[in-house]
Amino acid sequence: MRRLCALALILAIAIPTSAFAHGVVGDYVFLEPLIAEDPTPANEWDVVQPSWNKTSAGNNFALGSSLEKVLYLDENYMARVSVGIGTEWHYQWVKNAPDQRGFDDLEMFAKWAFYVSAKHEFLLSAAALLEVPTGNPSVEEQSHTSLGPLFLWEKGMGDLPNWTAIKYLRPFGFQGDFSYLPALGGHTSHLMSADQVVEYSLPYLSNSVQDIGLKPPFRNLYVFTEFNYSQIITGPSGQTFPSVVATPGIAYVSYHFELSFGTQLALNRASVPDTHAVVIGLLDIFYDSIFTKAGNWTINKGFPE
């Protein structure tokens, strides 16, 4: 893992920073969140998403990975439809009990960006999310298949006036989602969740507002905070309290990849037992910038010329 992170940092400095390949709506480039779902259909591979958290019951280490593929482009070559798949591997050190390890549920989704305004850096999308209990029952979140809707949005603030006192607000961006994921059988969880991401883009500041002299890698940094809510609204007694946490972090976004790190802070009493200490990371590859023909294939446009 140390070697992987070191290699990513070396590449971050070496790769040109004049263009981006992910999450582009108008002039704003939205990052890939750590916890929240990404509203933008994209060709991307979350190669590894490591996380460690110390809880009241012990410790949990997870390695997540997911893959997303754009299937449809509109007449302006904006990605409109994508599908994806992902899972996590867990190792849990449980107090006064044997260690548990194995894969979590298999997650699959189909995403549709049904409204895009490049002028206002605004996008709305919807997705269908399916979770199948294909992993180890001792570490899985759910023992029954779940299927439900996901509503997503993102908005850049670039349409604010370029006045002296206001222009520095233009690099702000907002991403969010709301989902309801009921189990299709059994008496276990019906999960409701919502996320809101507030991000500040130093690339946007330098390229679209005012160049303040930042050099790589600082020129390509984002600072962000996610606000994450989740709650089992139908489930076992004593397990239906809402969990609300803040996930602050920093991200480096280049033409080929994103490298992010963050932590989590409890915002209500119910989330304290699961957030004694948390570290989260993400290495996300925008593979259509590397495999420019195969990675950019879509159903309606085929391979790029």
Where are the predicted features?
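Bacterial N-terminal signal peptides
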Residues: 6-16
